[in-house]
Amino acid sequence: MASNIRIIFYGTGGSWPTPLRAMPGVGVKIDDVLNLFDCGEGTQKQIMKSSTSFMDIDNIFITHFHGDHFLGLLGLVQSMSFNNRTKQLNIFGPHGAIKILSNALNVGYYTLHFPLKIYELEPDRTYDLGKFLIRTMLNDHPVPALSYSIEERDLVRIDPEKAREKNIPSRIIEKIRENGSYVYKGNEYRIDDIAGGVRKGRRIVYTGDTRPMDRMIEFARNADVLIHDTTTDSSFEPMVNEFGHSSSRQAARIARQARVGRLYLYHYSPRITDTSVLLEDARKEFQETYESKDLMEYEVKVRRDVD
């Protein structure tokens, strides 16, 4: 059975909060597993306004340690503790995560009532998180920063005719799918016995802050969704590139070359009030470009292509 995958844009601004936008924070919910990518100031309040609960967060992935991407963590963790959370929270980040986050989370007087684990991730690695994989890449930014690719496992499509020929009931088919094989009435059935092709898993790429990079084209290749740093429109490219960011036009070029399904503009400069200029710039390069907005949600549809 294919997973339900939903993206929730909690906050879409950058640098500092404005009346229009909250700080960076993106939820990716895969069935009942809620992942948070970046946690800027005020993220917990944005989550309260959304269809999700901050108590349900399983994993937090920080792209880098500029304040607008992680200063919301302390309040979020304390609120979880005040609300009697018991399940483990995993926080992932680039080099320096353990020292920086341990210091930040030890500020003030409060008691942590649940297990919290901090992990430092290496670039150019793939990590198995059970229902999905996380792939990392080093960004072009003034401090250590990672892009994340959230990858659903490939799904074997069951050929109902093959299953019918072998008299395998549907409840046993699911056990075969889950385990790769299953013994039923004394016979072992393998997934290959009833397979009708493989449906490629869906992929979401979240860049965090970065200058435009050729490596991003390959990293995001054929992703269903690319959420890319688009701090300004093309008229400010030299300035934003100098500070380690991208324009909407540059992000759209990457999206087009990577052949992604859709691009979401993200991490708008607080000086920008009208993002339609960024969208117009981007769509000259890549038509399937969309503005992200605070509290907007998008369901990532199951791929129809089967190998």
Swiss-Prot record:
Record keywords: Endonuclease, Hydrolase, Metal-binding, Nuclease, tRNA processing, Zinc
GO MF terms here are: 3'-tRNA processing endoribonuclease activity; zinc ion binding
One short Pfam family name for this protein? Answer: Lactamase_B_2
Q: What is its EC number?
A: 3.1.26.11
Cofactor note (record) = Binds 2 Zn(2+) ions.
The cofactor(s) it depends on are:
Zn(2+)
Read off the Gene3D superfamilies from this record.
Answer: Ribonuclease Z/Hydroxyacylglutathione hydrolase-like
Positions bound to Zn(2+) 1: H64, H66, H141, D209
Q: Which residues bind Zn(2+) 2?
A: D68, H69, D209, H267
State the reactions this protein catalyses.
Answer: Endonucleolytic cleavage of RNA, removing extra 3' nucleotides from tRNA precursor, generating 3' termini of tRNAs. A 3'-hydroxy group is left at the tRNA terminus and a 5'-phosphoryl group is left at the trailer molecule
Per the Swiss-Prot or TrEMBL record, the active site comprises D68
State how it assembles.
Homodimer.
User: Function of this protein?
Assistant: Zinc phosphodiesterase, which displays some tRNA 3'-processing endonuclease activity. Probably involved in tRNA maturation, by removing a 3'-trailer from precursor tRNA.
Family, per entry: Belongs to the RNase Z family.
Name-wise, this protein is Ribonuclease Z
Q: Which organism is it from?
A: Thermoplasma acidophilum (strain ATCC 25905 / DSM 1728 / JCM 9062 / NBRC 15155 / AMRC-C165)
> What gene is this protein translated from?
rnz
